[in-house]
Amino acid sequence: PIVSVLKNKVQLFTLPHLNNQIQGAGSFGWPPVHGGQKITKDVWMDYLQKLYMNHNGKPFIASAFPQFHDIYHQAGIHKSYGYLDSSEGNTFEVTFQTALKSSSEIIQVATWNDYGEGTMIEPTKEFGYRYLEFLQAYYIKNHEHPFNKKDLQLPIKLYQLRKKYQNNKSISRELDQASLLLYDSRTKEARDILIKHSH
């Protein structure tokens, strides 16, 4: 196999139905769409529970996903895999909580920005910051955390200002500083710079 040339031992994870094709591979969860059908909550909950309970001692990665609404048919690629509704954010919350209750050491968020399959949690006009706010609220509940909901919007503000002032070297340097502050979790200082140029 391809991994035989690697110096360090690796653990491979596949979709559950492909798991038996690679000896010793673990599985990861994914929205269980198939046959172009609309997948109900009962179906995807059953899928996740079986994955988390019946892994036969093999490692597995739990999965949290917001929905599945692919564009394959509309794009003329092939038939749609199916549809799994967001239920106004409830699907993500339930899959995340179910993943937390599993014995998995890792939770995969499926996905950050897969617009082709409609599984994105990245902020959009349709969903706003719903998914990031949920994750932030969960984290804050369990950890000391100085951030708030408005901090989630600072990267897009930085991006918009970079576009607006792309030919202004002086302001661009200040925006570079704001970027470094954001990377360093110093959101108040970064926000002050961004507000200064948001007129």
Regions found by a protein language model. Give the residues of each.
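Glycan-processing catalytic domains of CAZymes
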Residues: P1-H199
